[in-house]
Regions:
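Short alpha-helical patches at protein termini and domain edges
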Residues: 1-467
């Protein structure tokens, strides 16, 4: 047997073994989808040649699963075809397993298709926008203002000069300990993280440009250096303006970090947004009106969901604290969730009645262990430990608090394999295309089992040998 054929058979054997392992993992995760619900993630992205794709992933408390990618270039502006695509996804996952469908597409076509899909299934789940994408939209609005755009332009001049030349990069390593450029795949999150780091590094940058190593270099006499040095050393107007911008953007970026560090982000999103607004108000000395208005516009128009209000109430750390406010938005959110999510998994009327027990802190909710563990264990675990006497409410709470607020952005996934799958489809036989689909399925799921999502881009451990 020739060596080439042996290699081909060996690769096929490895692929089939990894395919079996991935299928087994999917079966296990599907059981969790039925028990505690899941979030379907529709990650919309474009190829370098401008074609539109959607990758379908499913999140649950046991992990993230990649199902498939779809070329939607010909249907992205067709509501009927978008709706058919969404219906196929929902039927595959199971409508009553889904708590929410998270998208990063705010187009009117997708919004209309969402409406028809919810109507088709009688609203057993919610559509929400990825929290990362929403904050990125908000930061984009901030960046578009004239004063801020001028600050960002000068900041970019500094970072471009440093990162484009060997000597500044070498000296930066000596004088500035932290990396200045952010690697976040969220464009405007990265822009404002970079600006904050630049503001923090100013003193060290001044020292760098005043160093003997710099003064003796060929760069010291260049016109470009004099320009950059002038900004760093003496342009106090720029640095004050940059510091003022950071007072607005830091609370919003910090909110995303806060969500990242909590095992149950659904339970803290509502509170985290309120805290970010209060931080902006405090930072600006009360001159926050325009920023609050923009935040509220994005929140109300894109991000806010009854799920976030319900998660806020069902988080005992917040609900039993002095800062909890039972307003109309919270009341409406918990009522809508109680009814819509309870079609199969619990009885809405019983859950509503049991909510009074939770509200009044009666029964097991008033026990010493329940009080002690409010801050000691994750919210879902708290409900498992102390909600057994209110089983319908417990089921609802666990289904809501088990969900994420994010899409796939934090995994920083390279979708190039999916692009190759679709671009070359017409040149393959049906068997070859099936094999390529298996490679895609194994490749991305192997990646997801080893990747840790984070705001700066996924940290990845291990070699990805599939595909």
């Amino acid at each position: 047997m020739c060596q080439g054929l042996q290699c081909l058979l060996m690769y096929e054997s490895i692929l089939q073994e990894q395919l079996r392992e991935t299928d087994n993992r999917e079966r296990e995760l599907r059981q969790e989808w039925r028990r505690n619900g899941c979030s379907v993630i529709l990650d919309s992205w474009k190829s370098q040649c401008g074609k539109s794709y959607i990758s379908v992933l499913v999140y649950c408390s046991k992990g993230m699963m990649f199902l498939r990618s779809m070329d939607v270039s010909t249907i992205i502006e067709d509501v009927d075809l978008l709706m058919e695509m969404l219906l196929r996804v929902v039927n595959d996952v199971g409508a009553h397993n889904i708590v929410q469908i998270i998208t990063n597409d705010v187009s009117s076509y997708m919004q209309t298709a969402r409406h028809y899909v919810l109507k088709h299934y009688d609203h057993p789940f919610f559509f929400t926008l990825c929290a990362d994408h929403c904050i990125n939209l908000l930061l984009e609005k901030v960046a578009a203002s004239k004063n801020v755009s001028e600050v960002l332009m000068k900041a970019k001049e500094i970072t471009r000069f440093i990162y484009s030349h060997a000597l500044p990069m070498e000296l930066k390593g000596r004088y500035v300990q932290e990396e200045i450029l952010s690697s976040s795949s969220l464009k405007f999150v990265a822009v404002f993280i970079t600006l904050e780091r630049l503001v923090s590094a100013r003193v060290n940058l001044v020292n760098m440009f005043n160093s003997s190593a710099w003064d003796s270099s060929v760069w010291a006499a260049s016109n470009l250096f004099r320009h950059i040095s002038g900004i760093v050393k003496t342009d106090d107007v720029f640095w004050r303006a940059a510091a003022d911008v950071v007072k607005v953007t830091n609370p919003l970026v910090s909110m995303l970090y806060k969500l990242e560090t909590d095992i149950c982000p659904m339970g803290i999103l509502y509170d985290a947004m309120d805290s970010a607004k209060e931080d902006i108000k405090r930072n600006l000395g009360g001159k926050h009106g325009d920023y609050w208005a923009e935040i509220d516009r994005i929140w109300d128009g894109y991000l806010h969901s009854p799920l976030h209000a319900a998660g806020h109430l069902l988080n005992p750390r917040i609900f039993y604290s002095d800062r909890f406010l039972y307003d109309a938005e919270i009341s409406s959110g918990i009522m809508i969730c109680t009814i819509q999510l309870g079609q199969v998994h619990y009885k809405p009327r019983k859950a509503a009645a049991q909510l009074e027990i939770y509200h009044k802190k009666l029964g097991s909710f008033n026990s010493v262990p329940a009080f002690q563990q409010i801050t000691g264990i994750p919210q879902v675990q708290w409900w498992s430990a102390h909600g057994a006497r209110t089983p319908d409410l417990q089921t609802m709470a666990k289904r809501i608090l088990s969900q994420t607020c994010f899409g796939a952005t934090r995994y920083n996934i390279d979708w190039s394999l999916s692009e190759k799958l679709h671009v070359g489809r017409l040149n393959r036989t049906p068997l070859e295309h099936k094999t390529f689909c298996q490679m895609e399925y194994v490749h991305y799921n192997l990646f997801l089992t080893r990747a840790t999502p984070c705001l700066h881009g996924s940290s990845y451990s291990g070699d990805d040998s599939a595909g």
